[in-house]
Amino acid sequence: EGTDDPTGGYDMTGFARGADVSWLTEMEASGRKFYDSKGKERECMELLRELGMNAIRLRVWVDPENGWCSKEDVIAKAWRAHNLGYRLMIDFHYSDEWADPLDQFKPVAWEDHSVEQLLEDISSHTKDVLSALKNLGINVEWVQVGNETHSGMLFPDGKTDTQTGSENFAKMITAGYDAVKEIYPEAQVIVHLDQGNVASLYSRIFEGLKTNGGKWDIIGMSLY
């Protein structure tokens, strides 16, 4: 305490123990509060750090209807995490709303774009958000390019149920990868799927990416 160390003396290194707190600002705005085991009201991220968390994940939506998880909202949460010494993962959904295995809706502003335009959209959106974070001195350790992409992304163009779709998906992942490395060369890029217990799914997606020139550093796996 009383130093410039944002970690508050907590060890934020080693194995990443993280929480996705993307709903936090919306929850706070609706009046929700957080309490420790003694019933004392606490700031959520401070309490999580005290309980052993050392990393925060934040999702990004392109133009969400109510503003939550927008670029500006993400910056506000990332700044709070940064000032507590957290390591940070940014999760790009490339959608105006939640992207999951069945729903990979294009942002409204991208709906009529060609595949080549979509690749530019991915690149510019990724660089725009990450540049804003970097300009504030915030380090980003991991970047997730797409969310639960077990059937691809930006449907129908990047849906992996056809050869062309699989090729497009690899191009989209690579567009995101290259954009990340341009802003944060040391950041680790994650391709994220759900159903971590289904080996055939991972073989299909990652063999397809490999065959079609897709680039990634880490396989992200969710198990529910």
Where are these regions (language model features)?
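Bacterial Sec-dependent N-terminal signal peptides
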Residues: 1-10
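N-terminal substrate-binding region of glycoside hydrolase catalytic domains
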Residues: 10-87, 93-122, 128, 220
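Short loop/turn motifs at secondary-structure junctions
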Residues: 15, 52, 85, 138-139, ...
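Short, flexible loop/turn elements at secondary-structure junctions
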Residues: 23, 60-62, 147-149, 193-195, ...
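Active-site cleft segment of glycoside hydrolase catalytic domains centered on the general acid/base Glu
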Residues: 70-75, 79, 100-214
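Long, well-ordered mid-to-C-terminal structural blocks that present hydrophobic/aromatic surfaces
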Residues: 215-224
